[in-house]
């Protein structure tokens, strides 16, 4: 904890929390202070102008980041017949039906994402209490319930991230790693921002993208000047 405290103090000494930094400067600060012995993730928080308590203003979806996430993703798929073969060919790590459901009920879940063909939801629906709390329950809104399981698998493997507003109307997502170039991080950030703009609820009023902040796994946040995010 002592090392963490020193690092946090050093970070706070360099960052003006009342200031919004140009994107390049924000990334430079974060990378400079990301001194952990592993390749820290670069995370984004976006404060949206929505009332997350209203169901019609919940922003939820997914987007494939052009530069990926830097993470190896393991995918499980519920499918049968031809679709099962397509999922395997696309790179799915596990494909099954009742056998996969029993594996999940037993607590054996060596995967990060679950994808399901619509006709398998009679089985998948019984797993809500297990998959739901882990954020892995398939949902058509994020593209994980789909007849095109092959494309869903490819997207997941290519660096697709899911997003959803929390109770405060904030989106949290990972846009890469410390080892990524600034250009790669920016392309990923812009892809996410574009997806959020397209998902803007019709009932949202006033400023929609209120605040954008970046941080590393072990670091504090740096606010980003949105005017510097032009492609």
Swiss-Prot record:
MF terms (GO), sorted A to Z: rRNA binding; structural constituent of ribosome; tRNA binding
List UniProt keywords, sorted A-Z.
Answer: Repressor, Ribonucleoprotein, Ribosomal protein, RNA-binding, rRNA-binding, Translation regulation, tRNA-binding
- What PROSITE patterns does the entry give? RIBOSOMAL_L1 (PS01199)
CDD domains reported for this sequence: Ribosomal_L1
Which Gene Ontology BP terms does the record give? regulation of translation; translation
- Gene3D superfamilies recorded for this chain? 3.30.190.20, 3.40.50.790
**What's a GO cellular component annotated to this UniProt protein?**
cytosolic large ribosomal subunit
From the UniProt annotation, give the residues forming the signal peptide: none
> Mind telling me which InterPro entries this protein's record contains?
Ribosom_uL1_bac-type, Ribosomal_uL1, Ribosomal_uL1-like, Ribosomal_uL1/biogenesis, Ribosomal_uL1_3-a/b-sand, Ribosomal_uL1_CS
Instruction: Kindly give the Pfam families that the UniProt entry links to this protein.
Output: Ribosomal_L1
* Sequence similarity: Belongs to the universal ribosomal protein uL1 family.
Question: How does the annotation summarize its subunit structure?
Answer: Part of the 50S ribosomal subunit.
Report the function annotation for this chain: Binds directly to 23S rRNA. The L1 stalk is quite mobile in the ribosome, and is involved in E site tRNA release. Protein L1 is also a translational repressor protein, it controls the translation of the L11 operon by binding to its mRNA.
Q: What is this protein called?
A: Large ribosomal subunit protein uL1
- Identify the species of origin: Janthinobacterium sp. (strain Marseille)
This protein's gene is called rplA
